């Protein structure tokens, strides 16, 4: 067997453009974000999420709901159904805080918190494996979709309804920004 050497060429690594060349870009980006943030036209409706970190009333409502779910001890599992930004933020946060073995810990070791599974694609094996593991009566479903019409969100909901029956909807929390227009 011939051994091949890997050569690393760093000659252009240190020849990066001076930061001054990017100042115009940063200024332009700041102006665009400021315009979006301060706009009173239709664009502001699409960027309402910008203010979410400052909406303490919404945070308090979510915290209160989560506290009730934990206190009632009715649920053991949480299944988050969403795609892209509707799922990735909570998934990254949960995985960065908890052990990768979180779902295998006892409820006592999880201090009463629920196990969490994410269905963020249309893979039938993933969906089947998650649904097979669940005790339906002990599962809360969190369905997140900006429009409520995303195929990758609707399909797992329809599968769950078929799998668990019409009572599935009684154990769902739907989060969408398109109130009144959502398909879910």
Listing of model-derived features with the role each one plays in the protein:
Residues 67, 73-181:
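Glycine-rich phosphate-binding loops that contact phosphosugars or nucleotide phosphates
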